[in-house]
Design a protein with these regions (language model features):
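Extreme N-terminus of proteins, especially the signal/transit-peptide cleavage junction
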Residues: 2-11, 67
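Extreme N-terminal starter segment of soluble prokaryotic enzymes
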Residues: 8-14, 42, 71
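Intrinsically disordered, low-complexity regions
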Residues: 15-16, 77
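Short polar catalytic/cofactor-binding loops
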Residues: 18-22
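Glycine-rich phosphate- or other oxyanion-binding loops that anchor nucleotides, phosphorylated ligands
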Residues: 24-222
Length: 222
């Protein structure tokens, strides 16, 4: 078997995350696209940490002939909130992502409206704006600088993920991240403090929203 889908098959949703704990949450959070299930399928890809790892993983996942060649892509997992008042467990839906290089272009997320509505309808605290990329863990004064430059949150993989997805062909892209630490709630290590546990629970709860978004992309009136 080559793994190549039939030409008339709808592509599965590709959810990209960096960490094993993120992949665990996203795979445990709802229907996983198992054989025999109705509805669109989902592939959860662990890219590894950092922008270079994300770019490599996406290039391989979206290569010609792969099952996910034409897939819409969501970058998900945890992030650091930059705005005062953000708390662990808040959700960030990117209006655009921008890489860590000074002249990096923005990747707009034009299909994020249904995600915003569905997450808010679930009673989650949702922030929307620029999701900035970094190649290292951002703390202290650097966070304040990124926020002053217009970003609402930062992580290491979303911008690289969506940039690689768009480079591989036109497709819907989105970035949905859960705040694991924020200016007033800095996290020392994921899973060891209350904020990390709260963020994990929220991340686990958002997968049904991703399914709904994927289904909306398949509607004939789009």
């Amino acid at each position: 078997m080559t793994g190549r889908p039939p030409t008339d098959a709808e592509p599965p949703l590709l959810i990209a995350c960096a960490l094993g704990i993120e992949r665990f949450a996203l795979r445990r959070g709802g229907r996983g696209g198992a054989a025999g299930e109705a509805g669109p399928r989902v592939v959860t890809l662990r890219t590894g940490m950092g922008p270079q790892a994300a770019e490599r993983a996406l290039a391989e996942a979206l290569c010609k002939g792969s099952v996910t060649e034409r897939s819409p892509v969501i970058a998900s997992g945890f992030c650091a909130g930059l705005a005062p008042g953000m708390r662990p467990g808040d959700v960030v839906v990117a209006e655009a992502t921008r890489g860590h290089h000074a002249a990096a272009p923005e990747t707009p997320c034009r299909d994020n409206g249904p995600l915003l509505r569905a997450l808010r309808e679930r009673g989650l605290t949702v922030h929307s704006g620029l999701l900035c990329g970094s190649d290292h863990v951002v703390r202290g004064a650097e966070r304040a600088e990124l926020h002053a430059a217009g970003a609402v949150a930062v992580d290491m993989e979303s911008a690289a993920t969506l940039g690689a997805a768009r480079a591989a062909g036109r497709r819907p892209v989105a970035a949905v991240r859960v705040v694991v630490d924020a200016p007033e709630h800095e996290l020392v290590r994921i899973g060891t403090v209350r904020g990390g546990i709260s963020a994990f629970r929220v991340l686990r709860s958002v997968l049904p929203v991703f399914h709904e978004w994927h289904r909306s992309l398949l509607l004939p009136w789009r």
